[in-house]
Every structure is written in structure tokens, then in C-alpha cells.
Amino acid sequence: MKSDSIAVDVPAESSSVIKGKAPLLGLARDHTGSGGYKRGLSIFDFLLRLAAIVAALAAAATMGTSDETLPFFTQFLQFEASYDDLPTFQFFVVAIAIVAGYLVLSLPFSVVTIVRPLAVAPRLLLLVLDTAALALDTAAASAAAAIVYLAHNGNTNTNWLPICQQFGDFCQKTSGAVVSAFASVTFLAILVVISGVSLKRP
């Protein structure tokens, strides 16, 4: 009877140990894989923020320096085109500068997500603020794009004449600024997607 009790107790103890250890090993393996995956996304996030900063600063600087004066003038008139002649372009410069400033300030939080890829709070904060920056950036770029279109093509229904034949440099700079702004919009949209994917549970 003693040998029978020993034969029955030993397998029971070994099976309980196996059942207790197996899930822990599986969880540890999944945890490590998820951390490496999210760290890779965080590094990509940081690089995209640098690209978005460059695009936003280029857009704001180009629009802010768009100024052209025609070489001919009359006794009472001087023909000049500048971004501050149009409130839409003024809004563009201010809004894109705000977006660029936010992106610079967001870099430390992006670094935190690289060091601690499983941290939820900084990633959630970046998701909310990136969405707000994306909305502001899109509004500024879209409004400026409408004015640039009118500058190139005019509007015959309202007798608005195109001015780009006379102010070629001005139109070239404003068009380049709008293109750079939409590039930053694209980068921000990708950042929002990355933040959403990073918050997804493994």
C-alpha cells in the first residue's frame, strides 16, 4: 500500500508543477515579443516626428518669406504681394508654427515610449495631441491651398483675376509652402495610426 500511495502522489505533484509553470513561461515569451514590436514602432514614431518638424518648419518659413514687389510702379501705386495681405496666409503661418512647436515638444515623450515601449500613458497623450495637431495642420493647409488655386487660376464668376503671371516668385513660394504643409499632414496622420496600433493589446 505504501508503494501504491507513492506511485499515485508523485505524478500528481509533477503534473501540478507542469500546469503551474507552463502558462508563466508562455506569458513571459509573449510579453517580450510585444515589447520589441512596440519599441520598433516607437523608433519609427520618433523618426516620423523629425520629418514632420522639418516639413512644418519649411512650410511656415517659406510662407512667411513670400513677398514680391513688381519692378514697375506709378506715382500713386506700387504693386506688391505678401503673405500678410491675406488673412488665410497669416493663419497658415501661425497654425503651422504651432504644429511645429508641438512636434518639437513631443520628442521627449516619443523617447519615453522607446525606453518604455509598454507604457500606455505617454502613448495615449501623444495620440490625443497628435490628432489635434493633425486637425489644425489640415485646416491651415486646405485653406491656403484654396487661395493658391485662386492665385493661379482666378475665378471668372466673381471677376477674380489670376495673379501668378505677374507675381511668379510669390506664387511659387506659396505653392511650395502648401506642399510642405500637406507633407506634414501625411506624417501626422501616420503618427496617429502608429499610436493607435501601439495602444492595441497584444
Curated annotation (Swiss-Prot):
Cell compartments where the protein resides: Cell membrane
Record keyword Transmembrane helix present: yes
Alphabetized UniProt keyword annotations: Cell membrane, Cell wall biogenesis/degradation, Membrane, Transmembrane, Transmembrane helix
Record function comment: Regulates membrane-cell wall junctions and localized cell wall deposition. Required for establishment of the Casparian strip membrane domain (CSD) and the subsequent formation of Casparian strips, a cell wall modification of the root endodermis that determines an apoplastic barrier between the intraorganismal apoplasm and the extraorganismal apoplasm and prevents lateral diffusion.
One of the GO BP terms on file: cell-cell junction assembly
Species of origin: Arabidopsis thaliana (Mouse-ear cress)
Cellular component GO terms held in the UniProt record: Casparian strip; plasma membrane
TM helices/strands, residue ranges: 41-61, 91-111, 131-151, 177-197
Name of the protein in its database record: Casparian strip membrane protein 4
Extracellular topology ranges: 62-90, 152-176
Gene Ontology MF terms: protein homodimerization activity
Record has Chaperone as a keyword: no
Annotated membrane topology: Multi-pass membrane protein
Subunit structure: Homodimer and heterodimers with other CASP proteins. Interacts with CASP1, CASP2, CASP3 and CASP5.
Family named by the database record: Belongs to the Casparian strip membrane proteins (CASP) family.
Matching PANTHER family: CASP-LIKE PROTEIN (PTHR36488:SF11), CASP-LIKE PROTEIN 1U1 (PTHR36488)
